Curated annotation (Swiss-Prot):
GO BP terms: amino acid biosynthetic process; aromatic amino acid family biosynthetic process; chorismate biosynthetic process
SUPFAM superfamilies linked to this entry: Chorismate synthase, AroC
Record protein name field: Chorismate synthase
Enzyme class at the top of the EC tree: lyase
GO molecular function, one term: FMN binding
Cofactor: FMNH2
Catalysis: reaction(s): 5-O-(1-carboxyvinyl)-3-phosphoshikimate = chorismate + phosphate
Length: 388
């Protein structure tokens, strides 16, 4: 499985071509649209979420509600593009139009300046448009297809926010995967403790008034994987490493950890490793899951627990200082439309990105020309693991 995305924030559309999806998977635009709607929700989102109501168009690779095994083409139109027809025109335009929304005062924390240097842009908008988090809408659409495959295999995914703008969410002890998923998805903050919602929303509102932004820490959970996905035989085949790369590829994500994560650096080995146990009906398991479902780059059969830290959105309504790239004079940075926080949406993106990596690994490890062969091989392997 592989895919490419294309498109700009204010361009005509986002596009993806996905190759390697098995034939025979039940797939509809509505299934993908439900996931896109999750991404557009969440407290603290701005005006664009009211402009855009993302809906995907499938133009290849699906016939009569089932995938054919051919490349799948997805398109999401940018409704906001109607206001940018001249500025984002493909064909050459007059000079006064060309520089109508020209950007020469890069925003700290964004791709503006470094992208302009690398690609020799005199208008930094070219870097801004492609590097925008708008692209994550298509990554969620791709993830929705990946999750459809995982669902067929009995694998579930969830995400929730652990730290919201410096406020730690008190996760109830021994909360089940099912409860985490249910409560987080019903919360417009994606948290599992409703008692903290008022406090966090007040914090978001205050930060918005200040023209500032908030980041946080998101946890993604994958439930139902067997032991043995990934490999230790080469560095680039370790599945946790692939997930880490994917998480860090999400806009504004600056760190990733599994299980106890960096807290392991403060503990002894006896307080970190997970005791191995065995039961005649379920086979091998672990008494705890401090390592987050991985050993030596392979799944252990425990739930995958991966955390990602998202920096505060760098576009500030009270901008930091910058330098004009034409005059080299100090100026306040450019202000583009932004949100005080996008943590709930980022959680949906992270969940789908991780799901895509895991699905790709499964499709590489098992026969995957069609769903019948994939399911037969996967369930046979799961049975083998239970009886090892």
């Amino acid at each position: 499985m592989r895919y490419l995305t294309a498109g700009e924030s204010h361009g005509q559309a986002l596009t993806a071509i996905i190759e390697g999806i098995p034939a025979g998977l039940a797939l509809s635009a509505e299934l993908i649209n439900k996931e896109l709607k999750r991404r557009q929700g969440g407290y603290g989102r701005g005006a664009r979420m009211r402009i855009e109501s993302d809906r995907v168009h499938i133009s290849s690779g699906v016939r009569h509600g089932k995938t054919t095994g051919a490349p799948i083409t997805l398109t999401i139109q940018n409704k906001d593009h109607q206001k940018w027809l001249d500025i984002m025109a493909v064909e050459a335009v007059e000079e006064q139009i060309k520089f109508k929304r020209k950007i020469t005062r890069p925003r700290p924390g964004h791709a503006d300046l470094v992208g302009g240097i690398k690609y020799r842009f005199d208008d930094l908008r070219n870097a801004l448009e492609r590097s925008s988090a708008r692209e994550t809408a298509m990554r969620v659409a791709v993830g929705a297809i990946a999750k459809a495959i995982l669902t067929e295999l009995g694998i579930e995914t969830a995400n929730h926010v652990l730290v919201f703008g410096g406020i730690e969410v008190a996760v109830p002890e021994a909360m089940s995967f099912a409860d985490i998923k249910k409560v987080a998805e019903s919360s417009d903050l994606s948290i599992v403790n409703p008692k903290q919602e008022a406090t966090i929303k007040a914090h978001i509102d205050q930060v918005k008034k200040e023209g500032d932004t908030l980041g946080g820490i998101i946890e993604t959970l994958i439930h139902g994987l067997p032991a043995g996905l990934g490999s230790y035989v080469q560095w680039d085949r370790k599945l946790d490493a692939k997930i880490a790369q994917a998480v860090l590829s999400i806009n504004a994500f600056k760190g990733v950890e599994f299980g106890m994560g960096f807290d392991m650096g403060y503990q002894k080995g006896s307080q970190v490793m997970d005791d191995i146990i065995w039961h005649e009906t379920s086979g091998y398991s672990r008494r705890t899951n401090r390592l987050g479902g991985f050993e030596a780059g392979m799944t252990t059969g425990q739930p995958i627990v991966v955390k990602g830290v998202m920096k505060p959105i760098p576009t500030l309504y009270k901008p930091l200082m910058s330098v004009d790239t034409e005059t080299h004079e100090p100026y306040k940075a450019t202000v583009e439309r932004s949100d005080p926080t996008a943590l709930p949406a980022a959680g949906v993106v992270m969940e789908n990105v991780v799901a895509t990596v895991i699905t790709k690994e499964i499709l590489e490890q098992f026969p995957s020309d069609n769903m019948t062969d994939l399911k037969q091989a996967f369930f046979a392997y799961r049975d083998y693991v239970h009886h090892f």
